[in-house]
C-alpha cells in the first residue's frame, strides 16, 4: 500500500510504499479523520500521529466520508458532492457512481495521511525542509485583513511582499505578483458612475418612448371611435330613409 503523507506546517508531501502487512494492520478498520499512531510503521516514525484523510482502491475509486462500509457501494450523487465532478451535466441531474466506504481495508492502493503530531526523529523531505507559501491572497479585502490595513491604505504595495522573481525561457529575470481583485481605484469609480449615468439615460429614454406611444395610441383610438360613430350615423340615416320610403308606398 502507498502512503501519501503531508505535513501542513512545512508544506511538504512525500509518498511511501509499504508492503509489510504487520505494519499496515494498525490502519485497518480505521475511519476517515481518525488519528493513528505511526509507531507501527517503524522506528523512524516513532512518536508521530497521523490523521487519515482519504484514499482510493486499486481500480481508482475514492473513499467517501460518511459511508460506513469497508467495501464499494453505488450512490446517487449530484454535482458538488465529493467523489463526483458533475461536469457536462444538466442542472439538478444526479448520477449513480461507485465509491468506497470510509473504513480502511486491505483493498486500498493509496492512503492519504496528514501529520498531526511530530515525533522524535526528522523525516527527510517532510519535516526537515520548509517550502515557503508563495501564493498570498488576491482579493483586496483579504489583503487588508492579512496586513491589518484600513480602507484608506494602498493595498498594491503590500502585494510586493509575496512577489515572485523567476527566470523565463529567454534567460531574463522577471517578477510576478497576483492581480488584485475588487480593488477600488479612481478608474473603477469612474466606470461605476458611467454605468449609473447610462442606466439613468436608458430609463429616461424608455419613459419618453412610453409617453409617446401612449399619446399615439390615444390618437389612434380617437380616430377609430370617430370612424365608428360616422359609420353608425350613416347606417342610421340609411335606415330612416328606407323606413320613410316604405311608409309612403304603403300609404
From Swiss-Prot:
Record keyword Hydrolase present: no
GO biological process, any: translation
GO CC entries: ribonucleoprotein complex; ribosome
Renumbered residue ranges of the record's region Disordered: 218-251
A Pfam family that the UniProt record links to this protein: Ribosomal_S6e
Origin: domain of life: Eukaryota
Keywords annotated in UniProt: Phosphoprotein, Ribonucleoprotein, Ribosomal protein
PTM annotation: Ribosomal protein S6 is the major substrate of protein kinases in eukaryote ribosomes.
Listed Basic and acidic residues bias regions: 220-233
Molecular-function GO terms, alphabetical: structural constituent of ribosome
Ranges of Low complexity composition bias in the record: 239-251
Function summary: Component of the 40S small ribosomal subunit. Plays an important role in controlling cell growth and proliferation through the selective translation of particular classes of mRNA.
Family stated for the protein in its record: Belongs to the eukaryotic ribosomal protein eS6 family.
Annotated protein name in UniProt: Small ribosomal subunit protein eS6
Amino acid at each position: 500500500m502507498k502512503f501519501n503523507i503531508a505535513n501542513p506546517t512545512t508544506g511538504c508531501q512525500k509518498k511511501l510504499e509499504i508492503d509489510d502487512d504487520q505494519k499496515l494492520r494498525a490502519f485497518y478498520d480505521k475511519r476517515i479523520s481518525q488519528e493513528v499512531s505511526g509507531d507501527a510503521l517503524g522506528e523512524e516514525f516513532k512518536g508521530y500521529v497521523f490523521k487519515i484523510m482519504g484514499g482510493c482502491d486499486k481500480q481508482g475509486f475514492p473513499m467517501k466520508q460518511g459511508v460506513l462500509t469497508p467495501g464499494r457501494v453505488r450512490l446517487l450523487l449530484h454535482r458538488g458532492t465529493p467523489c463526483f465532478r458533475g461536469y457536462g451535466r444538466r442542472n439538478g441531474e444526479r448520477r449513480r457512481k461507485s465509491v468506497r466506504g470510509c473504513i480502511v481495508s486491505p483493498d486500498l492502493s493509496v492512503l492519504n495521511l496528514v501529520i498531526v503530531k511530530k515525533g522524535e526523529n526528522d523525516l527527510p523531505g517532510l519535516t526537515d525542509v520548509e517550502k515557503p507559501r508563495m501564493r498570498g491572497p488576491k482579493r483586496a479585502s483579504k489583503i487588508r485583513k492579512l496586513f491589518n490595513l484600513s480602507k484608506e491604505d494602498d493595498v498594491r504595495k503590500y502585494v510586493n511582499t509575496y512577489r515572485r522573481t523567476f527566470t523565463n525561457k529567454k534567460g531574463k529575470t522577471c517578477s510576478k505578483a497576483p492581480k488584485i481583485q475588487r480593488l477600488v481605484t479612481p478608474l473603477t469609480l469612474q466606470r461605476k458612475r458611467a454605468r449609473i449615468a447610462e442606466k439613468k439615460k436608458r430609463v429616461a429614454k424608455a419613459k419618453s418612448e412610453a409617453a409617446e406611444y401612449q399619446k399615439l395610441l390615444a390618437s389612434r383610438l380617437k380616430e377609430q371611435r370617430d370612424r365608428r360613430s360616422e359609420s353608425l350615423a350613416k347606417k342610421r340615416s340609411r335606415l330612416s330613409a328606407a323606413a320613410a320610403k316604405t311608409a309612403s308606398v304603403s300609404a
